[in-house]
Amino acid sequence: MSTIPITKRGAEMLKDELQRLKTKERPAVVNAIAEARAQGDLSENADYDAAKERQGFIEGRILEIESKLAAAQVIDPAGLDADGRIVFGATIDLEDLDSGKPVTYQIVGDDEADLDSGKISISSPIARALIGKYEGDVATVVAPGGEREYEVRAVKYL
C-alpha cells in the first residue's frame, strides 16, 4: 500500500470525522432502522430504505477514512527543513505575473484541499508546477484555462 501525504491538521480532521461517524451517525442510523422496522412491512417502507441507504454511506465512509489514515504519512509543515524549497505542506506567497495580484497557497493532501481557504491539492496543476521551486523562481502552470505564470515571493513552513 502506498503512503498518502497529509498534514497534521488534515489527519486531525479525518480522525474527528471518523469519531463523529462512529459515535453519533452510526448509532443514529441504527435507531432509525429499528424504528422503521417497527412500522411493519419492509417491502414498501421508504423510511427503512432511506435508513439502510444512509447506513451504507456511513459504513463506506468509515472504511474509506480508516484506509486513508492507515496509509497516511502525516507531515507537520512546522517541522520541515527544506531549505526554502517548495515541498508538500509549505505555504507559498506568489505573484500572478499576468494580473500582478498576490496570492498565498498551502500545498495539502487531496482531502484537505479548499481553494477558498488557500489550500491546494498536491495533485493540482499549480502544486505540481510549484513543487521543487525556490523563492524568486517563476512557475508556469498549465491548466485547462490556459497557461499562467507565478513568481514565488516567499516559502514558509507553518
From Swiss-Prot:
Q: One matching Pfam family, short form?
A: GreA_GreB_N
Cite the InterPro entries for this sequence: GreA/GreB_C_sf, TF_GreA/GreB_CS, Tscrpt_elong_fac_GreA, Tscrpt_elong_fac_GreA/B, Tscrpt_elong_fac_GreA/B_C, Tscrpt_elong_fac_GreA/B_fam, Tscrpt_elong_fac_GreA/B_N, Tscrpt_elong_fac_GreA/B_N_sf
What keywords would UniProt list here? DNA-binding, Transcription, Transcription regulation
List the Gene Ontology MF annotations in alphabetical order.
DNA binding; RNA polymerase binding
What are the GO BP annotations of this UniProt entry? DNA-templated transcription elongation; regulation of DNA-templated transcription elongation
For this chain, the annotated S-S bridges are none
- Entry annotated with the keyword Transcription: yes
Q: Which SUPFAM superfamilies match?
A: FKBP-like (SSF54534), GreA transcript cleavage protein, N-terminal domain (SSF46557)
Q: Belongs to which family?
A: Belongs to the GreA/GreB family.
Task: Report the function annotation for this chain.
Answer: Necessary for efficient RNA polymerase transcription elongation past template-encoded arresting sites. The arresting sites in DNA have the property of trapping a certain fraction of elongating RNA polymerases that pass through, resulting in locked ternary complexes. Cleavage of the nascent transcript by cleavage factors such as GreA or GreB allows the resumption of elongation from the new 3'terminus. GreA releases sequences of 2 to 3 nucleotides.
The name under which this protein is listed is: Transcription elongation factor GreA
- Gene behind the chain: greA
